């Protein structure tokens, strides 16, 4: 029983330490990186360049998985694109 509690505790700690986020990556002006059908390879490369685990074209913009906390992603409520 103690071993099971220890295992669960370790897994929870790993989840906290290796926390990442998912979302639309943004350009310096705050706009999403645009893409078109068939450009998932390009989006995946852009996401990995930003230290994400992977990405794809979720038309009309690149969606990334596993981004570090310091990478800015699109936020609907704080949208600065075109302003």
UniProtKB/Swiss-Prot annotation:
> What functional role does this protein have?
Inhibits the sodium currents (Nav) in an apparent irreversible manner. Produces small depolarization and induces repetitive firing in squid axons. Is specific for arthropods (crickets, triatomides, crabs and squids), but is non-toxic to mice.
Q: What is known of its domains?
A: Has the structural arrangement of an alpha-helix connected to antiparallel beta-sheets by disulfide bonds (CS-alpha/beta).
Superkingdom assignment: Eukaryota
Q: Which GO terms describe its molecular function?
A: sodium channel inhibitor activity; toxin activity
Disulphide bridges, residue numbers? 31-81, 35-57, 43-62, 47-64
Does the record carry Signal as a key word? yes
Tissue specificity field: Expressed by the venom gland.
Classification via InterPro entries: LCN-type_CS_alpha_beta_dom, Scorpion_toxin-like, Scorpion_toxin-like_sf, Scorpion_toxinL, Scorpion_toxinL/defensin
Q: Which GO terms describe its biological process?
A: defense response
Query: Under the cellular component aspect of Gene Ontology, which terms does the record hold?
Result: extracellular region
User: Which residues are the signal sequence here?
Assistant: 1-20
Q: Which family does it belong to?
A: Belongs to the long (4 C-C) scorpion toxin superfamily. Sodium channel inhibitor family. Beta subfamily.
Q: Which SUPFAM superfamilies has this protein been placed in? A: Scorpion toxin-like (SSF57095)
Q: Where does this chain mainly localize? A: secreted
Any one Pfam family match given in the protein's UniProt record, by short name: Toxin_3
Arranged from A to Z, the UniProt key words for this protein are: Amidation, Disulfide bond, Ion channel impairing toxin, Neurotoxin, Secreted, Signal, Toxin, Voltage-gated sodium channel impairing toxin
Q: Domain LCN-type CS-alpha/beta spans what residues?
A: 21-82
Give all Cysteine amide modified positions: 81
The name this protein carries in UniProt is Toxin TdNa3
- Give the subcellular location: Secreted
